[in-house]
């Protein structure tokens, strides 16, 4: 699997079933650029979770809905409900643990 880019219109449908990880980011964000490849790699290794990315500048309504003030902001959703979030860059092993504990 890979990280699929979604927008505000896709969001509710994307996260409604199962476990989803959403990487809220922006093109100008340095730590976001570092985190992207980590999540891409994990998307191939943690196959029972869906991975998405959303640009907060292009989708400010969703960023506002979740009170996102800092990025990267990675949220785990289970059946459409946010169960946890992480703000800032964390290394691969820590991100894997964060995702696994919230599945």
Model features per residue range: what roles?
Residues 1-13, 50:
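N-terminal "domain-start" segment that seeds a small globular fold
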Residues 15-25:
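Short active-site neighborhood of thiol/selenol oxidoreductases, capturing the structured segment around
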Residues 24-38:
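Conserved redox-active cysteine motifs that mediate thiol-disulfide chemistry
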Residues 56-63:
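Structural microenvironment flanking redox-active thiols in thiol-disulfide oxidoreductases
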Residues 66-75:
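Structural micro-motif
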């Amino acid at each position: 699997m890979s990280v699929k880019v979604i927008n505000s219109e896709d969001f509710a449908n994307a996260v409604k079933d199962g476990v989803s990880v959403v990487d809220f980011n922006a093109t100008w964000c340095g730590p976001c650029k570092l985190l992207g490849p980590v999540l891409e790699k994990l998307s191939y290794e943690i196959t029972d979770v869906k991975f998405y990315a959303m640009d907060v500048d292009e989708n400010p309504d969703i960023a506002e809905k979740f009170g996102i003030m800092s990025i990267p902001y990675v949220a785990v959703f289970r059946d459409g409900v946010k169960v946890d979030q992480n703000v800032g860059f964390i290394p691969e092993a820590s991100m894997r643990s964060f995702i696994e504990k919230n599945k």
